[in-house]
């Protein structure tokens, strides 16, 4: 017995001590992989800055984005007084771009959130129950996929009427099938796993299996796709506003600003350049952030 205890103590003494700060949780592993991606980190910082600017835009903007008019500097280019210049009505473009970030970002995020919520629910039902549920939901998705996203959004806005709220609904509708297919595919794979069969064998209800076991397994894919989809939604919302179907003047939405700038693009190109640059940088940042999240959450994809 003493010999056994002596050997046991020797083994315990030989084992390295693991300090609490050396234990790597999934979050630590994710952060370790993500911070190595410099482009994704830069994009994340830009997105955070954009969100802060969007929240406090009306306090940060040096001039009123809708009711300030400088009639002495119509269509003047960038200057110390007006960093991005002035449009044909004397409005400060820098202030309008800042406030436009609030509107464009909100439209993109809310549209994707609605599409993700409905699409995730439909994808879970289609993948888990299969049968006629699967066939019905996927046929509806096929019909929606048959139309280009922007064309479908135009059709929806034509029925509902113009306005930023209807643009959000329109963009959300063509986001639904994309999320539904993504979640359905993940659900079909997860439902075959042993832990799902174990949960069923102990009497877990379908709702419990879906919400406690399958849905968490799809979260990483949803987060990545959600992030990248925001850029698409911002472009779609701006396109609808550019066509006169979205935000209406004098609302400082980026697409609406481009619509107003069309008549002056030759004599005052800066009126269109800065809204375009804002859209480009925002969409690029969300796409790079989505790529970084994908590689950090599932490094096997990168390999």
Curated annotation (Swiss-Prot):
<protein>
    <recommendedName>
        <fullName>Glutathione transport system permease protein GsiD</fullName>
    </recommendedName>
</protein>
<comment type="function">
    <text>Part of the ABC transporter complex GsiABCD involved in glutathione import. Probably responsible for the translocation of the substrate across the membrane.</text>
</comment>
<dbReference type="GO" id="GO:0005886">
    <property type="term" value="C:plasma membrane"/>
</dbReference>
<comment type="subunit">
    <text>The complex is composed of two ATP-binding proteins (GsiA), two transmembrane proteins (GsiC and GsiD) and a solute-binding protein (GsiB).</text>
</comment>
<feature type="transmembrane region" description="Helical">
    <location>
        <begin position="105"/>
        <end position="125"/>
    </location>
</feature>
<feature type="transmembrane region" description="Helical">
    <location>
        <begin position="266"/>
        <end position="286"/>
    </location>
</feature>
<keyword id="KW-0812">Transmembrane</keyword>
<keyword id="KW-0472">Membrane</keyword>
<dbReference type="Pfam" id="PF00528">
    <property type="entry name" value="BPD_transp_1"/>
</dbReference>
<keyword id="KW-0813">Transport</keyword>
<keyword id="KW-1133">Transmembrane helix</keyword>
<comment type="similarity">
    <text>Belongs to the binding-protein-dependent transport system permease family.</text>
</comment>
<keyword id="KW-0997">Cell inner membrane</keyword>
<feature type="transmembrane region" description="Helical">
    <location>
        <begin position="165"/>
        <end position="185"/>
    </location>
</feature>
<dbReference type="InterPro" id="IPR035906">
    <property type="entry name" value="MetI-like_sf"/>
</dbReference>
<dbReference type="GO" id="GO:0071916">
    <property type="term" value="F:dipeptide transmembrane transporter activity"/>
</dbReference>
<feature type="transmembrane region" description="Helical">
    <location>
        <begin position="40"/>
        <end position="60"/>
    </location>
</feature>
<dbReference type="InterPro" id="IPR025966">
    <property type="entry name" value="OppC_N"/>
</dbReference>
<dbReference type="InterPro" id="IPR050366">
    <property type="entry name" value="BP-dependent_transpt_permease"/>
</dbReference>
<feature type="transmembrane region" description="Helical">
    <location>
        <begin position="222"/>
        <end position="242"/>
    </location>
</feature>
<feature type="transmembrane region" description="Helical">
    <location>
        <begin position="144"/>
        <end position="164"/>
    </location>
</feature>
<dbReference type="InterPro" id="IPR000515">
    <property type="entry name" value="MetI-like"/>
</dbReference>
<feature type="domain" description="ABC transmembrane type-1">
    <location>
        <begin position="101"/>
        <end position="290"/>
    </location>
</feature>
<keyword id="KW-1003">Cell membrane</keyword>
<dbReference type="Pfam" id="PF12911">
    <property type="entry name" value="OppC_N"/>
</dbReference>
